[in-house]
Amino acid sequence: KEPLEDKGWYRTMQSVARVMMMVRSVGISYRNQYSMSLPGFMPMIGDAFGQTRSVGAMSPGLDFAFGMIGDSYIDKARDNGWLLMNDSVATPATTNKTEDLQIRATLEPIKNLKIDLNANRTMTTAKSIQYMYEGNPTTQSGTFSMTTLSLGSAFEGSGNAGNGYHSATFEKFCKSLDGFRQRVEARYANAVYPEGTLLAGKKFDPANGGVNKYGSDVMIPAFLSAYTSMGGSSLDIFPSLARLLPNWSVRYSGLTRLPWFRDVFKSVNINHAYKSIYAVGSYSSYSTFMEYMNGLGFVSDATTGNPIPSSMYNVSTVSINESFSPLLGIDLTFENNLTAKLEY
């Protein structure tokens, strides 16, 4: 009787089953760290969870004791009369927040072929909040990074002096700026200039100062669209989790199953790894920013004083760091334990 392992349909089903079960492990790590410094807090600290009874409520509150607070706690403390509301208090409240997501997965679609996928997204935000003034004037700064794919330009030549070091991707980026500027400006179609500006109450008119073609609101989305696979038509400076893309490393160790390799080598490993990180080196908020809605707003033009459309973020640098480590590598161990390594 023919063994089951020799039947074609059985081998096919084995291969299909292996592909369906190729995910060997998945790991997800999420860290959300928040801290607050609140000068001018007046109530005394009690013995039970740090609480004391003040008028109408315990202070600083069980939400504070168990770390379940956010920036809105400053409004709560002010409304309860816990803060020293005096212009002589020059030290603002400060908050620091870090969000870090790490996703890892190991795949083995066929025997001896292992693929490690990893994706991460990290954002840090620091705020300085002048709670003693009306409107809680706030300044903000931070950093941002996430994994992406930028293979479209990875193998593009750098050109030469004869063609002015021409880059097709850079040309695509430059040509897209006008289109992105128009799309950003279209978001202000029904906007009204905010109070406290020279044009307060009037409908937005680009003739008074439109979106800057070379501002970060335009150039960063155009840059991501041209150089990465996550850009698309989005206008986000800080891409969301939905646009997170993985990097990877690949290792194949099955060549020693072949007779010639098995006779000469103890092990033969073929390696490949790819890494691409989009990063906002640092950003800060404009001191003259006035919000219109959903993060859109206006800043004062340094020359005319007119309000011009802008997000609140003044971004100094963005970058995409891409590397193959290696593009192709071979690790060899001979029968006499001599090792050799080739990488490109």
Q: Predicted regions span which residues?
A:
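Exposed, low-structure sequence patches enriched in small/polar residues
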Residues: 1-344
